[in-house]
Design a protein with these regions (language model features):
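Phosphate-binding site recognition
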Residues: 1-232, 236
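A cross-kingdom feature that marks ATP-driven nucleic-acid transaction machinery
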Residues: 201-336
Length: 336
């Protein structure tokens, strides 16, 4: 038996969960049923099965969190859909969808996977992308969604420390909302310099989902353009900003590429807690003892200044990793 949108019983008849607990506990060993339930509201599904105060706590034999396509699969999809694709097209698919099958399928069923076609398909009248972020998250947040949306909008725009976010929201205290966005909703994560201690105050917040990040940065921020159906104007803004925005996402792409290679024991960025100085885009510690990679990420290799990265790595080595041997690289579009 398969039950989809299992969390909806909260809105219909919450006692269903207690009834199911009694039936399951009584007949589980006697029956030959494989019961599968699924749901799209992360926080409620977590509550149902992982909150020890809920009747179905501990009853799930297996919990599967559906993941996005990995980078190898995205490349295969690109080759099948657009054999002449460029790495910039691949980066755009990653930037806009994060590999979420639903969004990738929408693109593949309707267009050729190129930057311009993807932007035109997303930003048009009656596009399913226009309200997708709102529809996904209002169900999670409920009627008090406004503050959460303001926080996510700030983070998507590069305001990523708690004091900066609170200042952007008029000095509103947001500690509780930040905690829930991390622990209950699984939407943002804390980023600390690599090897920083858990209690370190050098924290930046980041939206995990590529599409949600993109949606807040453009669809939510430029809602006024959508309301007057100025889709041409919004397309122009996205295209003009694409080199800068995709450059940020290229760093995320390479971190994922490092992770999927299974050759590293820790992957992150590094910066000094005070002043964000000597920042290194990617620091990856290899499985081999005292071996690491330090990478500067640039869309174009011609913009790379090796002497700057060398100075930053020496600073990191002296401060944190004195015994490490570093491989210094520049990663660009051509390395995807």
């Amino acid at each position: 038996m398969v039950i989809d949108e299992f969390q909806e019983f909260y809105n219909i008849n919450e006692s269903v969960y207690s009834d199911m607990q009694n039936i399951w506990d009584t007949y589980r060993k006697k029956s030959k049923m494989n019961l599968i339930v699924s749901g799209s509201v992360y926080s409620l599904m977590q509550k149902i099965f992982q909150n020890n105060k809920e009747p179905l706590f501990g009853r799930a034999d297996n919990i599967i969190k559906l993941s996005a396509f990995d980078l190898t699969t995205l490349k295969e999809i690109m080759r099948d859909n657009n054999p002449n694709y460029t790495n910039d097209d691949l980066l755009a698919l990653y930037t806009f969808t994060g590999g979420v099958p639903k969004y990738v399928e929408l693109f593949c069923d309707n267009i050729t996977l190129s930057i311009d076609e993807m932007i035109s398909f997303m930003v048009r009248d009656n596009s399913s992308f226009t309200d997708e972020g709102k529809n996904l998250l209002i169900e999670e947040f409920g009627k008090n969604y406004a503050t959460y949306f303001s926080i996510l909008s700030a983070i998507s725009g590069g305001i990523n420390t708690q004091p900066e976010i609170e200042a952007a929201l008029g000095d509103k205290s947001i500690g509780g909302q930040i905690k829930r966005l991390i622990e209950d909703y699984n939407i943002i994560v804390r980023q600390r310099p690599i090897l920083a201690k858990e209690g370190s105050q050098a924290v930046r917040y980041e939206i995990q989902d590529n599409f949600i990040r993109f949606w807040f940065n453009y669809f939510d921020r430029y809602r006024s353009l959508i309301e007057i159906k100025n889709f041409v104007g919004l397309q122009a803004i996205i295209k003009a900003n694409y080199p800068t925005y995709s450059g940020i996402m290229l760093e995320r792409y390479f971190k994922q590429q490092f992770a999927e290679s299974f050759q590293y024991r820790a992957i992150g960025s590094w910066w000094e807690p005070r002043g964000n100085q000597n920042e290194i885009d990617i620091v990856a510690l290899k499985l081999e003892k005292n071996q690491a990679v330090a990478a500067e990420v640039k869309r174009q290799k011609k913009n790379f200044k090796p002497e700057l990265l060398t100075a930053k790595v020496e600073h990191l080595r002296n401060k944190l990793l004195p015994k490490f041997q570093f491989e210094l690289v520049c990663l660009s579009l051509e390395d995807m």
